[in-house]
């Protein structure tokens, strides 16, 4: 069983990494192609392309200029410790043990516009490039065209390494924008997408902030409980959520909570 997460826009490169243990991204040469493309853009182009402020555009133009194919402790940080958003608040990697991080390294993947697929302990240089960005490139009009089947094939390889755990299953805890880079026809696995709904205004609905955090919390649950069979995820009951069999189907598992009446 392999879990996929989305990355975060917010990054933390100020807090020192709590471990020196690391691996390297597996698509560095492909990332370098994207960086070369991004370096051709002026700050105003980056701002328009990504719909971000002038200040953020300048910051990211600087990041692209400083990005190097040589990853070091000075310019990089482990992905799961560098990402800093709702999902990663739920995952809370900084409080995981070394054994937990070792399990995550085998069972959790982070989809990325620049890096394709990251393992938790992969060194990562700071960047901003969302998967949905319409950055034209030699392969097509956007990053889905750029990555093609590559991301899916690497996920297949990673799941093949877990075949002793049972039938290959990909647990989709990523956003729709990011999971679109995974091609179901190429994927050699069953897909399960957990959905988190909260009671509000007289009905259950997905509330983005809560859903993002819950995705990270479920990934953490899978790591700390050493979950290798998808069925065990149905026992997830963190933060008041509970599996709702009646609202679920084979590929869409609904977890609901009711904090207000």
UniProtKB/Swiss-Prot annotation:
<dbReference type="InterPro" id="IPR005583">
    <property type="entry name" value="YaaA"/>
</dbReference>
<dbReference type="Pfam" id="PF03883">
    <property type="entry name" value="H2O2_YaaD"/>
</dbReference>
<protein>
    <recommendedName>
        <fullName>UPF0246 protein Reut_A1014</fullName>
    </recommendedName>
</protein>
<dbReference type="GO" id="GO:0033194">
    <property type="term" value="P:response to hydroperoxide"/>
</dbReference>
<dbReference type="GO" id="GO:0005829">
    <property type="term" value="C:cytosol"/>
</dbReference>
<comment type="similarity">
    <text>Belongs to the UPF0246 family.</text>
</comment>
């Amino acid at each position: 069983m392999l879990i996929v997460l989305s990355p975060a826009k917010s990054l933390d490169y100020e807090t020192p990494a709590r471990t020196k243990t690391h691996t390297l991204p597996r698509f560095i040469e492909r990332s370098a192609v994207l960086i070369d493309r991004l370096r051709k853009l002026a700050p105003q182009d980056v701002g328009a392309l990504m719909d971000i402020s002038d200040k953020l555009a300048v910051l990211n133009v600087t990041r692209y200029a400083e990005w190097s194919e040589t990853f070091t402790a000075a310019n990089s940080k482990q992905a799961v410790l560098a990402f800093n958003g709702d999902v990663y608040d739920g995952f809370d990697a900084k409080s995981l043990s070394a054994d937990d991080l070792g399990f995550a390294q085998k069972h959790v993947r982070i989809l990325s516009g620049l890096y394709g697929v990251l393992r938790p302990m992969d060194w990562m240089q700071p960047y901003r490039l969302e998967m949905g960005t319409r950055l034209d490139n030699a392969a097509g009009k956007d990053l889905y065209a750029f990555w093609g089947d590559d991301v899916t094939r690497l996920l297949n390889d990673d799941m093949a390494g877990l075949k002793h755990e049972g039938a290959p299953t990909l647990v989709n805890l990523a956003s729709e924008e990011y999971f679109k880079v995974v091609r179901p026809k190429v994927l050699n696995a069953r897909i399960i997408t957990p959905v988190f709904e909260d009671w509000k205004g007289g009905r259950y609905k997905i509330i983005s902030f809560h859903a993002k955090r819950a995705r990270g919390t479920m990934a953490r649950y899978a790591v700390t409980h050493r979950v290798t069979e998808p069925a065990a995820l149905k026992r997830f009951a963190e933060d008041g959520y509970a599996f709702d069999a009646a609202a679920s189907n084979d590929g869409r598992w609904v977890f609901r909570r009711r904090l207000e009446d």
